[in-house]
């Protein structure tokens, strides 16, 4: 169990970091398929060991936090994801669960089945039939305002066709996609212009939709299909999902013709079989079908779980397979020193993407496959998205193949490695002396869920470490303008913003700090438990095994990891320096006398100049505030930035206390 728990936490930390790079920084360091493979692995492990599932796991959250370059949109009805299944048996189990919940016995349920588009989920808000706002899914609760870009998509009506039944307000949900023809045209143009080419149509659609300049989006030939509704203000609502889709068509909204009303499980399986056959002829990428209980009243009865509805599920299409060649095996060093083998492949095109890498995850996998460099292998996309080496085609093996030699020294720093036979891993023993481990540790330290140093991306950290400007987290807080402006793509303005962000990060929560310093097996949830119990770093550093194991989710192994961390003189020195007056990290707490916001219902309006909306919300939640999306008599406080809207007017009418941005920062004590 120990090894499983450690492995699960490693997967979570890696996925959180990749989320931060991909969604918050627009700087992915792995392909989508590598990311999705890891997510699928984590879901499976949490299914097998449900006691190890935590509320802060990436499997319990959707997508990403909205970026600062777009205005934030709060989804009043969350945009949830879907659970996935991969075989008929799993679907029959789903059908049985639904019938049992509805007390249907052996009677047939009716379903509406649609395509599962491989694109970007968006929300379109229409008021009296006029498009007034469009937003991305984001993390399911807060998305990005992409209204101007959505207006450039020809298939999306700016005004619904009036049939006398248009609701006062309706939120249409659907998927923005890029067709295969549009994708080829985009990459051919990019090749001629020597500009960035996209790996697959989904990435191209995402990048196109999130352009700051809508005129660029307009050239990308995006398409849209709607599949559902969020908020709807109308007395007349269709009784079934299929009727809702038909109503969308009447209003002029694009709805896929590949949808089917199914009575009972067999008709659903027949539709799945049909889609499997026509998939290659669609002209755009899909990765399965979506199966929804058709009756809306039954959907309401079934409700939701943490991140998905109970009344719908995605049945993924089978993995595509191709033959390719192992050109080399490289070794990557992670934050904890674990060395992971990665197969470099002769690029092969599978299901809309070029695949050139496949993680082998452990050296035991190389042994299991009997893999040699130069071998021909079968590679498939598990779940239609994750690159996986299935087996070696031994009959095609030539005399030119060579064995995979396990590293005796770290491929990055040259230090000796040690083997953990129990966990079947090879580990670099150098710690932060190894530049690879140092880089990964620092990237974790500055990440959004940790110290949240906005603008301190992976590329900047790589440069700072390579130039030996920083050697530990303390050095981040000693950076000056001269050191930063000498870096690539760092001008005066960007440097000033980064230095401001570093200064701002000194005010954090104790829980974030504990998560940031990288104690083995201490994720966000356990860090929060430790922070709540000990209140301050000095108390935690003096803790013993007895007090640690009294805390929720802290067993002997995790407690030992905490003790070992604080018995390390190097770690102690770094923490003491970070908390010293010279660096000045301070912990916010709901127990501080500066607790102006605790327990208050707060609404934001307008744009903040110094903090992003997301950062401000995180700070207030840490101080015990409750963030609301709309103004009502129950609101205690409105925080107003620039370019305020109707919320400010309504707050004045209701005589709600209003504070401007400067006063907000003054109360927080960060400016």
Curated annotation (Swiss-Prot):
Binding site residues for NAD(+): 32-36, 81-82, 114, 137, 175, 292, 316
UniProt cross-references to PANTHER family, sorted A to Z: CHROMOSOME TRANSMISSION FIDELITY FACTOR 18, DNA LIGASE
Residues that coordinate or bind Zn(2+): 410, 413, 428, 434
Catalytic activity: NAD(+) + (deoxyribonucleotide)n-3'-hydroxyl + 5'-phospho-(deoxyribonucleotide)m = (deoxyribonucleotide)n+m + AMP + beta-nicotinamide D-nucleotide
Stretches assigned to the BRCT domain: 592-671
Top-level taxon in the UniProt lineage: Bacteria
Protein name as annotated: DNA ligase
Active site per database record: 116
Organism: Baumannia cicadellinicola subsp. Homalodisca coagulata
Family: Belongs to the NAD-dependent DNA ligase family. LigA subfamily.
EC number, as in UniProt: 6.5.1.2
